[in-house]
Amino acid sequence: APPLGRHSTIVFGGTSTLHPPKCNWQPTRKYCCFLSHYKNEAGSDARDLRDLLQRMANAPVFLDSSDLADLKRLFTDGVQQSDVLVVLGTKGVLTRPWCLLELWEAHTQGVPIIFVTVEGRGFDFGDAKHFASHFTEELEVANPGALELVEKGLRQQGATVDDLAAALALLLDAA
């Protein structure tokens, strides 16, 4: 399993994003990172962060809306080809089937996972831990029908919702 437990908060704006510090990122895969996000809550933040990270690292960042034409290849061409999975923490990110499956894919493929809380978007680690500890019930209430999609995606990988819930709890406890 990948190293877990990295957490940060990001606020956009100001001069630091206009002229960010540079680093010499040496990617081991095609992308320095994969940005996992709930488009309705953090779509513009994800685009801004992608642009910022690409300038800082001088390396490509995977963002599904710009780098993928076929969602079936999201895992093989996205998550598996990224050095790190960055989850943009917003209120509903853990209720989205694709975001959950991206987390699972990263977990099973040994891709490190970092949570970045997007300020002002309602993410709370306490709420997220409660959600993970009552995963099946909470997911169905928060996003009716999502559980079925997640179960289907996990089944194709030989996994269960309980496996995902345990990995999610581990990730959130380490953050």
PLM regions and their residue ranges:
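Conserved N-terminal substructure of TIR/SEFIR domains
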Residues: 1-93, 97-126, 140-172
